[in-house]
Amino acid sequence: MTVLLLIAAVVVGYLAVMSILTPEQFSKTRIAREAPIQVRLKEVAHVEKAFHDVYNRYAPVEELRQFLTDGRVFYVRSEGDYTDAMREAGINEREAAAKGLITRDTVWVSARDSLLKGGMTPEEFLQVPGFPQSIIEIDTASVAQEIGEDVVMVPVFRTAVPLSVYLADQDHKLLNTAIRDAEARYQGTGYPGLALGSLKEVKNTGNWE
């Protein structure tokens, strides 16, 4: 009987310790894994902006991969300053460029060379950091927005990684609780993971910010 009581005490003690350590470890693991994913989602948003500058819309994941493979982006090479004296003389910036007073040239360069660093491939860029078997989600849509008296359709995007991708190997009860808590945010419309952007409004920030 004494042995059984001792074993029971050990088991109870172990469970009590684990009830504290498991949530703590879950939280530490979540924070550590989310940090590089947050950085990557911001990088994806930067690439989406470059795509939008060229095409005036956003790209789903496969099209963004193709854009990074053989697409081009542009920048304006500037020489000379458009001065107050030019403005006061009634010369706008386009006229100043035509007169040779300033230079404004559009230069096209490789999207891959311009946007990807360190020799990273488009395929690697779109993988979830730490989980190369999973691809970052990218969804696109259009939302109505009032501009003056007009209503125009504005392109939007959301890039995201679910909790179930980067915490699949953690305690399932804690994971399911985290998913439910995330979904309950924003009046029940929260995303169960990390997400940047929105499909319902013009937004370019992450849900962790």
Short names for language-model regions:
Residues 6, 27, 50:
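Residue-level detector of functional hotspots within protein domains
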Residues 53-209:
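Low-complexity, acidic interaction segments enriched in glycine
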Residues 1-19:
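Hydrophobic membrane-insertion alpha-helices, especially the h-region
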Residues 20-35:
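Aliphatic-rich helix starts adjacent to a transmembrane/signal segment
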Residues 34-55:
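N-terminal alpha-helical signal peptides/signal-anchor transmembrane segments
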Residues 1-2, 12, 31-36, 41:
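Compact recognition or signaling/catalytic modules
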Residues 3, 26, 83-87:
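Generic ordered-secondary-structure signal
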